[in-house]
UniProtKB/Swiss-Prot annotation:
This is ATP-dependent rRNA helicase RRP3. It is found in: Nucleus. One of its GO terms (cellular component) is cytosol. Residues 141-312 form the Helicase ATP-binding domain. ATP-dependent rRNA helicase required for pre-ribosomal RNA processing. Involved in the maturation of the 35S-pre-rRNA and to its cleavage to mature 18S rRNA. ATP binds at residues 154-161. Residues 1-11, 513-528 have a biased composition (Basic residues). Pfam families: DEAD (PF00270), Helicase_C (PF00271). It comes from Pyricularia oryzae (strain 70-15 / ATCC MYA-4617 / FGSC 8958). PANTHER family: ATP-DEPENDENT RNA HELICASE RHLE-RELATED, RNA HELICASE. A motif (DEAD box) lies at residues 260-263. PROSITE patterns: DEAD_ATP_HELICASE (PS00039), HELICASE_ATP_BIND_1 (PS51192), HELICASE_CTER (PS51194), Q_MOTIF (PS51195). GO terms for biological process: rRNA processing. Residues 336-486 form the Helicase C-terminal domain.
Length: 538
């Protein structure tokens, strides 16, 4: 075993050499699937390589531009209309005052090295099985490395986290300091997963990352912030609490701000809190804004927080879902919903599956139903404590449970890379929720399937979703043989009785404690408590 010393990021001088990740790395770094095998390199050569990579990219861009100019001169007489549609370079867009770069999805895929990422971070990407940049990474990373503010508009599951994490870590390597970057996320689960990504990418350089979210102890969070982490990932409300109440905590020296899922941040009415947070941050900073959509609210946030940004988008088609996603409606009578769900669970046994329900109560019941019939199901919803929500996610990611039964708390932003199937057990109420639900599968270029169970009560809703999310395109039906489905009917009825009894006991137990599970709403006096439902899951 190597006796090499562990070298940490310095705050007063250039960082020391990289080391190979050891088994003692923090828990988040355990997602590394293989060790970085190349010999460590000193920071000075890393900087030199980064500059050389950027110069090489600049030379390549100049050569490409010269070739494009020659082609345009040759064909200008008879292909003027095609020239009008050509993709401008960053330099052209900047010179002409243009702030949006069209999609380059037809451009041959580059490697992370081609984008200007330094070797140690490229090795970390390889260790995490990031084989090649996704379209949003390919477009956003070079702009970020050039020092520009960036707006990224991309389909859900496109790899946005690495698109901002890699440039921030590369800048941190060049000029290390505490409290270097801040990432704001709309949900606790997304914040936790962004933190895990940063720690995994920075495992070889002893990166310190603090995740600050609601539902957890503020004192322990204050202690973590007092240790001056390099990166802070937070939900807006809890971050503002610390900015206003935690002594000695300041972000006045911050270099990078990221607002991830910005449209969701504003949908959840975080706008006033974001305004307050911005007052605590320095004006001289770099800002990245990533969003699935570009609404008027997001545009207002952009004007308030970004300086002369370049906007990149990889959503080239009008259809809102990715091309690698197979979508099927399943039309059935309402009374047979449970039977068809069990048929699907059996048909796709062994596949990682998310089953979406509309209410907390139904998520609990369906989870019990599946477990009674020996399927590895676990619930995820807003009435679980934060630790239990993260526990459910970790079990699902680790494949110790292959079915996650969730309300829309899991529909947006969760980074679960390998979800094979999404089942809409209850139809969502609008097209955007549908898009974000089915976007949990077929992420970052992978294929996936989404099956929506549609009863006689959902037809009008489905037609609206079909028109808004699919531009009216008719999807192929999922049509199982009815006799094969009804084979499960008797066993499902027995499991339904068991689920009703268990739900009744749960309600009675919670009634005694003063916290009753409800389907759509919770009373203002209801407290969030640990959910005893899944205690047997460990």
């Amino acid at each position: 075993m190597s006796s090499a010393k562990r070298v940490k990021l310095s705050h007063s001088k250039a960082p020391g050499p990289f080391r190979k990740p050891s088994s003692g790395d923090r828990a988040a770094a355990k997602v590394l699937t293989k060790k970085i095998t190349q010999a460590p390199k000193a920071a000075a050569p890393i900087k030199q390589k980064a500059r050389e990579a950027e110069e090489d990219d600049d030379d390549d861009d100049k050569d490409d531009k010269d070739e494009e100019d020659e082609e345009q001169n040759d064909d200008s007489s008879d292909e003027a209309s095609e020239n009008d549609d050509s993709t401008p370079t960053v330099e052209e867009a900047t010179k002409e005052g243009q702030t949006e770069l069209p999609s380059k999805e037809e451009t041959p895929t580059k490697s992370f090295r081609d984008l200007g990422i330094v070797e140690p971070l490229c090795e970390a990407c390889e260790a995490l099985k990031f084989k090649k940049p996704t379209p949003i990474q390919e477009q956003a990373i070079p702009l970020a490395l050039q020092g520009r503010d960036v707006i990224g508009i991309a389909e859900t599951g496109s790899g946005k986290t690495a698109a901002f994490a890699l440039p921030i870590l590369q800048s941190l390597l060049e000029k290390p300091q505490p409290l270097f970057g801040l990432v704001l996320a709309p949900t606790r689960e997304l914040a936790a997963q962004i933190g895990q990504t940063f720690e995994a990418l920075g495992a070889s350089i002893s990166l310190r990352c603090a995740v600050v979210v609601g539902g957890l102890d503020m004192v322990s969070q204050s202690t973590a912030l007092g240790k001056k982490p390099h990166i802070v990932v937070a939900t807006p409300g809890r971050l503002l609490d610390h900015l206003e109440k935690t002594k000695g905590f300041s972000l006045r020296s911050l270099k990078f701000l990221v607002m991830d899922e910005a449209d969701r941040l504003l949908d959840l009415d975080f706008g006033p809190i974001l305004d307050k947070i911005l007052k605590f941050l320095p004006r001289e900073r770099r800002t990245f804004l990533f969003s699935a959509t570009m609404s008027s609210k997001v545009e207002s946030l952009q004007r308030a927080s970004l300086r002369d940004p370049l906007k990149v988008s990889v959503s080239s088609s009008q259809e809102k879902t990715v091309s690698t996603l197979i979508q099927n409606p399943l039309f059935i009578p309402h009374k047979h919903k449970d039977v068809y769900l069990i048929y699907l669970a059996n048909e796709f046994a062994g596949k990682t599956t998310i089953v979406f329900t509309r209410t907390v109560n139904e998520a609990q019941r369906v989870s019990i139903l599946l477990r009674t019939l020996s399927f590895g199901a676990i619930p995820l919803h807003g009435q679980l404590s934060q630790s239990m929500r993260l526990g459910a996610l970790n079990k699902f990611k680790a494949r110790s449970r292959d079915i996650l039964v969730a309300t829309d708390v899991a529909a947006r932003g969760l980074d679960i890379p390998e979800v094979d199937l999404v089942i809409n057990f209850d139809m969502p109420q609008d097209s955007m929720t549908y898009i974000h639900r089915v976007g949990r599968t077929a992420r970052a270029g992978r294929s996936g399937r989404a099956i929506s169970i549609i009863t006689q009560y959902d037809l009008e809703l489905w037609l609206r979703i079909e028109k808004a999310a699919l531009n009216g395109r008719k999807l192929p039906l999922f049509q199982p043989d009815k006799e094969e489905v009804m084979v499960f009917k008797e066993r499902v009825e027995e499991a339904q009785r068991h689920a009703r009894e268990e739900m009744k006991a749960l309600h009675e137990d919670r009634g005694k404690k003063g916290a009753v599970l409800k389907g759509r709403k919770r009373g203002s006096a209801t407290k969030r408590r640990h959910d005893d439902m899944d205690a047997e899951e460990g």
